[in-house]
Design a protein with these regions (language model features):
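N-terminal pre-domain/capping segments
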Residues: 3-4, 14-111
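Distinct, well-ordered alpha-helical segments
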Residues: 43-50, 177-193, 209-223, 284-287
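Acidic-and-aromatic substrate-binding clefts and catalytic sites of carbohydrate-active enzymes
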Residues: 43-44, 63-73, 94-104, 174-179, ...
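Acidic (Asp/Glu)-rich catalytic clusters
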Residues: 47-54, 71-88, 104-119, 158-161, ...
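Conserved, mostly hydrophobic/aromatic
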Residues: 59, 121, 202, 232, ...
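Gly/Pro-rich active-site loop or hairpin
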Residues: 70, 100, 138-148, 209-267
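Active-site acidic/histidine proton-transfer and metal-coordination neighborhood
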Residues: 102-199
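C-terminal helical cap(s) of enzyme catalytic domains, especially alpha/beta-barrels
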Residues: 283-303
């Protein structure tokens, strides 16, 4: 029998306006409830709204937007972290690269974690550059036994350096290596078992990659080790005709909600994060989208959202749309 879900938040709110957990932990990490990304376009709203009225259980930051940032964005983050749990989500770890780990970046990441005290630190199963060149994209890697050993060694090194478990997200991909011999879901599962890292299951990325490469999305979700999944990402994508691209600029598509329900039922319920990084709407619209997530957990599929269409010549989404928002004028 599938676990029962209701449409209430995963957290209660105490008299001070801070959420109190009512859901169990996994890998020693709590179910944070329903959250959104902390973006500069919403700084003014958050700073002028009492925390008890924010309407979300937690926030996720793009780590690179706050590394070396001691300005107004840091002040907002400090205020938010005093009232809600925060998760650090990075895009520059490049865990799959053959280049040495960037120790300077890791030191800055560790320093930021010391300031923020995040619930966890996450990044992506990908590589972003080599030999000092940053592609500003989350690139797929060959999924082979050799690369599994390579990435596992790097994950252990990062975890030792940071002094905490690392959480890795499945990327959206638009090409594959002919040398790959391990399905991505098996690769992630073996990596999690070998390193005790957590998994961030992006169900939008699963749908995007499944459509692009022709694999079965439910099989992907069902094959991951549920006890390692600590978080789920929701986002919108763009249909480019021959392929889909993960663009984070529209509401969650209808095809993604059943995958979200499947993931939540399989895990017994884990933290949900709505990503929206371009064409960012008012904060109230994000709360409305989170309400859809609560309904979906109850088995009530939200109304169909329009899927935007793009041109066939786009093959990926650069990272610039995620970076820099913390530094925009407010």
């Amino acid at each position: 029998m599938s676990p029962a879900f209701d449409v209430s938040p995963a957290f209660d709110v105490n008299k001070a306006g801070e959420p109190e957990a009512v859901c169990p932990e996994r890998l020693g990490l709590p179910n944070l409830g329903d959250g959104v990304g902390l973006r500069s376009v919403h700084f003014r709203h958050l700073m002028h709204t009492p925390p008890r009225d924010w309407g979300v259980d937690w926030f996720e930051i793009i780590s690179e937007n706050f590394i070396d940032n001691r300005g107004y964005a840091a002040h907002v983050l400090e205020t938010v972290a005093a009232h809600r749990p925060v998760v650090m989500h990075g895009v520059s770890l490049s865990i799959g690269s053959s280049a040495p780990l960037d120790r300077d970046y890791l030191r800055k990441l560790r320093d930021l974690a010391a300031r923020v005290q995040p619930a966890w630190v996450s990044d992506h199963l990908c590589w972003t550059g080599i030999n000092g060149v940053n592609t500003h994209d989350l690139l797929p890697m060959p999924l082979t036994p050799e690369s599994l050993i390579h990435v596992a060694d790097r994950v252990r090194a990062v975890q030792d350096f940071l002094g905490r478990a690392l959480v890795l997200e499945n990327p959206s991909t638009y090409l594959q290596f002919q040398a790959s011999s391990i399905p991505e879901w098996e690769f992630l599962g073996m990596l999690a078992e070998a390193t005790s890292c957590g998994l961030l299951l992006d169900v939008n990325n699963v749908h995007v990659s499944a459509t692009n490469h022709g694999f079965d999305a439910p099989t992907y979700i069902d094959s991951l080790p549920a006890d390692h999944i600590v978080q789920v990402h929701l986002a919108g994508f763009t249909d480019h005709g021959t392929h889909l691209i993960d663009t984070h600029d529209h509401p969650v598509a209808a095809a993604v909600w059943p995958l979200y329900l499947r993931a939540q039922r399989r895990t017994g319920g884990v933290a949900t994060l709505l990503e929206w990084d371009a064409r960012i709407p008012p904060f109230a619209d994000l709360l409305h989208e989170l309400t859809k997530a609560r309904l979906a957990r109850a088995g009530v599929m939200p109304a169909v959202a329009r899927v935007p269409r793009g041109t066939a010549d786009s093959v990926s989404t650069p990272l610039q749309f995620q970076l820099g928002f913390a530094h925009e004028p407010v």
